[in-house]
């Protein structure tokens, strides 16, 4: 394709709010154009990359007998009300009304709709298992879209749904999909790691995320260097081994702590280590207030709280709620209280006595507080995030951290949707059973961004061969010169029969062409320049920067060999 005919609006400067390198490079190289916050158009080069990604996805889905369909993005509210997610999903669900006042949602996911499609069709165990997938735009009303395609309000996704007669069948499809995802991310050029994860609003009993390792990743991965252990930090279990630091029990004292609001400020004020401070936070669980205690250097993990209490209806109490409940602001909270409120403490609080806690009065704290004498703990549990260097639950070693971008996730849904939506089949005994389900997602547009995040240098993108928008970049330095133009035209005609070629025939300065070529990042470059009359051209590899002069008689052999050896 001739570059003069392709819409590639490269940029010299990018908006300052473009923080991620992938966001900056996708804008700068003319692959995407922002419409408004979190919404982008995919321009010709990006569309070609997306087509290459989706071709790989389709191949791997068909390899495991997953069948492609296409469902509407617009979904009626009644389906979401059946599953209970219309109210539970929250403000991220984009809702709208038609002219008749009927409620709809622009789908962020399609569990309800696909269940409604199959519930009157998959009637017998003989029709199972069945796996359906689609590739489609999804919508989520992100509060703060950021990092370009990594967290947008409209995004492209591959979502698949499987239906089974028994758990063994689900386990097999889950494993097949897990392996397919591993192959997909390897083929598109992403270093992705599967990690144990939380199922979030989708639900289900078991899930893995596929994380593309990246410094700008919004998720923290906990992993072992001694085993295959890897988990999202939200799910990483903290191993409790008692390490009591008990001292002689001291009398309770109330002390003035002016302008002290955080655990670290309190530790500094008292001249004590922050891990000897105990923080108190108030949560509302299914409408009931509870207190949760952790040591000063630990952070409460609300995902673990949701798992512990078996509900998603958990939220941190607001400042007004806290003041109305205990008469003090959040920085002064403590468990010594004359109100009926259940108290839960992280396991590691047990290691301390003579605690330092808030006095439930602004500007004051209590020291030498002791469990049993001054307050009681209803239950202890693992309520916090793991720290780097702590022991891992598989016994393999200690926790190491890395950042990652979630590019895919697989779920075992069980009967969460089929039971609520009455999707049943007859088993081999003729009894009605709820369909057992799995769901599996890949962020296609997010994968595009993750590829760029992992494959770039200071000059631009470095596309992996499998997804590159074109194989070769043919550049005529000065098309006004007959020998250069004629040779470049001839090479374009020859190589275009075997490779996808982007032919830069523009009337631009050589520096502009070379800068754009580096920015766009095609794997191989052929430059027709001053030695065109001798039949000599330059061949350059984008990844290594290696270049050599080659006679046109040898050019096809050289290019073919180099292309075959590309990653």
Curated annotation (Swiss-Prot):
Catalytic activity: tRNA(Pro) + L-proline + ATP = L-prolyl-tRNA(Pro) + AMP + diphosphate
Signal sequence extent: none
Principal location class: cytoplasm
EC code(s) of this entry: 6.1.1.15
Annotated keywords: Aminoacyl-tRNA synthetase, ATP-binding, Cytoplasm, Ligase, Nucleotide-binding, Protein biosynthesis
Subcellular compartments: Cytoplasm
Pfam families: HGTP_anticodon, tRNA-synt_2b, tRNA_edit
Biological process annotations from GO: prolyl-tRNA aminoacylation
GO CC annotation terms, alphabetical: cytosol
GO molecular function, one term: transferase activity
Top-rank lineage group of the source organism: Bacteria
Domain notes for this protein: Consists of three domains: the N-terminal catalytic domain, the editing domain and the C-terminal anticodon-binding domain.
Role description: Catalyzes the attachment of proline to tRNA(Pro) in a two-step reaction: proline is first activated by ATP to form Pro-AMP and then transferred to the acceptor end of tRNA(Pro). As ProRS can inadvertently accommodate and process non-cognate amino acids such as alanine and cysteine, to avoid such errors it has two additional distinct editing activities against alanine. One activity is designated as 'pretransfer' editing and involves the tRNA(Pro)-independent hydrolysis of activated Ala-AMP.
Subunit structure as annotated in this protein's UniProt entry: Homodimer.
Similarity comment: family membership: Belongs to the class-II aminoacyl-tRNA synthetase family. ProS type 1 subfamily.
Name of the protein in its database record: Proline--tRNA ligase
Organism: Staphylococcus aureus (strain NCTC 8325 / PS 47)
Gene: proS
């Amino acid at each position: 394709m001739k570059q003069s005919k392709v819409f590639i609006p490269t940029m010299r400067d990018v908006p300052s709010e473009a923080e991620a390198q992938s966001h900056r490079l996708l804008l700068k190289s003319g692959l995407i154009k922002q419409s408004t916050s979190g919404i982008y158009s995919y321009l010709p080069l990006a569309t070609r990359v997306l087509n290459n990604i989706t071709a790989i996805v389709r191949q791997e889905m068909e390899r495991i007998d997953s069948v492609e369909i296409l469902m509407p993005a617009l979904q009626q509210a009644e389906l979401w009300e059946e599953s209970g997610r219309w109210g539970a999903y929250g403000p991220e669900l984009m809702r709208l009304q038609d002219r008749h006042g009927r409620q709809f949602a622009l789908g962020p996911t399609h569990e309800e709709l696909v269940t409604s499609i199959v519930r009157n069709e998959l009637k017998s165990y003989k029709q199972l298992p069945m796996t359906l997938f689609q590739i489609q735009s999804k919508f989520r009303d992100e509060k703060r879209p950021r990092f370009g395609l990594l967290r947008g309000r409209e995004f492209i996704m591959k979502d698949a749904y499987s239906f089974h007669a028994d758990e063994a069948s689900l386990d097999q499809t889950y494993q097949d999909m897990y392996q397919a995802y591993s192959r997909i991310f390897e083929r598109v050029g992403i270093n992705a790691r599967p990690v144990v994860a939380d199922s979030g609003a989708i639900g289900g009993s078991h899930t893995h995320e596929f994380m593309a390792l990246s410094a700008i990743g919004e998720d923290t991965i906990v992993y072992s260097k001694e085993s295959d252990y890897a988990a999202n930090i939200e799910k990483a279990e903290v191993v409790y081994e008692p390490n009591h630091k008990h001292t002689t029990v001291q009398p309770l004292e109330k002390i003035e702590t002016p302008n002290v609001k955080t655990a670290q400020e309190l530790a500094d004020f008292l001249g004590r280590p922050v891990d000897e401070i105990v923080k108190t936070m108030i949560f509302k669980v299914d409408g009931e207030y509870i207190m949760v205690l952790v040591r000063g250097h630990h952070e409460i993990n609300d995902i673990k709280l949701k798992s512990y209490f078996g509900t998603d209806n958990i939220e941190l109490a607001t400042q007004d709620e806290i003041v109305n409940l205990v008469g003090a602001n959040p920085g002064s909270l403590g468990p010594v209280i004359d109100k009926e409120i259940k108290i839960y403490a992280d396991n590691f609080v047990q290691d301390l006595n003579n605690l330092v806690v808030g006095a439930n009065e602004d500007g004051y704290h209590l020291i030498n507080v002791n469990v049993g004498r001054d307050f009681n703990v209803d239950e202890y549990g693992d309520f916090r995030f793991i720290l780097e260097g702590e022991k891992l639950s598989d016994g393999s070693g200690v926790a190491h951290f890395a950042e990652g971008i979630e590019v895919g996730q697989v779920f075992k849904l069980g009967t969460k949707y089929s039971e609520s939506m009455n999707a049943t089949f007859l088993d081999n005994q003729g009894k009605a059973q709820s369909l057992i389900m799995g769901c599996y997602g890949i962020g296609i547009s997010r994968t595009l961004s993750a590829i760029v995040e992992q494959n770039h240098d200071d000059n631009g993108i470095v596309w992996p061969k499998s997804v590159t928008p074109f194989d070769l970049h043919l550049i005529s330095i000065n098309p006004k010169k007959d020998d250069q133009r004629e040779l470049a035209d001839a090479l374009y005609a020859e190589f275009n029969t075997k490779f996808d070629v982007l032919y830069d025939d523009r009337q631009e300065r050589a520096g502009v062409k070379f800068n754009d070529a580096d920015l766009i990042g095609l794997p191989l470059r052929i430059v027709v320049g001053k030695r065109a009359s001798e039949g000599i051209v330059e061949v350059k590899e984008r990844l290594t920067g290696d270049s050599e002069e080659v006679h046109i008689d040898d050019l096809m052999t050289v290019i073919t060999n180099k292309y075959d050896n590309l990653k």
